[in-house]
């Protein structure tokens, strides 16, 4: 079998046969077969691959890919109400403009001597989030809401010096899986029943499961079903009476209308930053926050 080079390929550098031969000569070889001679013969493909003819230009390739993409139903043309951690909110143009600024967007990890732009941006973000949440301390963003909730729960358990955690039985199963991954085996996660009529946490079941081993009571406003825990203060009081920390997950957009978690007794607040100007991106590109006093 002869391994052939390309006459000229727009996407593969050094693909011209003359350049290929020059490179082989430099390392003392005559052909690509010699370069691959240590690969076992039985796993080498010897027949021609059934590939379509290559596109001759970037323009042709782009038109082909765009034609394929048009078969999809896009959220640019349709509204999406799936939710569950990835929400279709309008993102003002100023968000993309600021996010793309060179002093903020960089491929470099960043050090204290050259990353002042990012530090300034994060300081302003933390200050505004603290004002929105009415809390004193806000962290730099986490990877997503699930990580923020998991870390907040572990924070609360360390403060309470207990290993038991109560979470709502109605919460997102994927988020619960992440919480269990972060917290076990150090912490024990137990679910509180959901009131089937209201979609909220069952207070009787919550109080029955509170004991001196419970360090954290976690709930969300709004919860997975979109319902608000109208008994939020009673939940927080029950947690505190049992010596536990109250951790609340929130949608920050809702805080323009509803009371902040601190007002009904939350010790730690966490939530999702994706609604605040982050585009949907195949379920990725998420971000979360944590705040405390």
Region spans (language model):
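N-terminal entrance/gating region of PLP-dependent enzymes' catalytic architecture
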Residues: 37-124, 130
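Charged, compositionally biased N-terminal leader segments and the immediate start
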Residues: 1-16, 23
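Conserved PLP-enzyme active-site core in the AAT-like
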Residues: 11-12, 147-293
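Short loop-beta-helix segment that forms the pyridoxal 5′-phosphate
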Residues: 112-114, 131-151
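PLP-dependent enzyme catalytic core of the Aspartate aminotransferase-like
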Residues: 22-25, 127
């Amino acid at each position: 079998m002869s391994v052939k080079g390309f006459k000229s390929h727009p996407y593969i550098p050094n693909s011209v046969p003359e350049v290929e031969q020059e490179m082989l000569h430099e390392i003392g070889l005559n052909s690509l077969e010699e370069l691959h001679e240590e690969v076992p013969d039985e796993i080498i493909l010897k027949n021609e691959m059934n590939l379509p003819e290559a596109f001759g230009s970037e323009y042709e390739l782009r038109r082909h890919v765009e034609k394929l993409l048009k078969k999809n139903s896009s959220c640019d043309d349709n509204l999406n109400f799936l939710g569950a951690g990835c929400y279709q909110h309008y993102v003002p143009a100023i968000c993309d403009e600021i996010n793309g600024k060179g002093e903020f967007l960089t491929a470099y990890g960043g050090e204290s001597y050259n990353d002042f732009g990012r530090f300034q941006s994060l300081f302003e973000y933390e200050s505004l989030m603290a004002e929105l949440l009415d809390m004193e301390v806000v962290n730099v963003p986490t990877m997503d809401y699930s990580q923020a909730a998991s870390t907040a729960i572990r924070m609360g358990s360390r403060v309470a010096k207990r290993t038991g955690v109560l979470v709502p039985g109605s919460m997102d199963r994927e988020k619960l899986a992440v919480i269990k991954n972060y917290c076990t085996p150090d912490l024990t996660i137990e679910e509180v029943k959901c009131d089937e009529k209201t979609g909220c946490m069952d207070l009787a079941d919550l109080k029955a499961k509170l004991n001196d081993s419970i360090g954290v009571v976690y709930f969300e406003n709004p919860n997975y079903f979109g319902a608000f825990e109208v008994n939020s203060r009673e939940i927080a009081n029950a947690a505190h009476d049992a010596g536990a920390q109250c951790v609340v997950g929130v949608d920050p957009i809702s805080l323009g209308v509803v009371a902040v978690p601190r007002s009904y007794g939350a010790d730690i607040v966490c939530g999702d930053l994706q609604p605040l100007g982050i585009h949907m991106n195949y379920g990725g590109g998420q971000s979360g926050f944590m705040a405390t006093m």
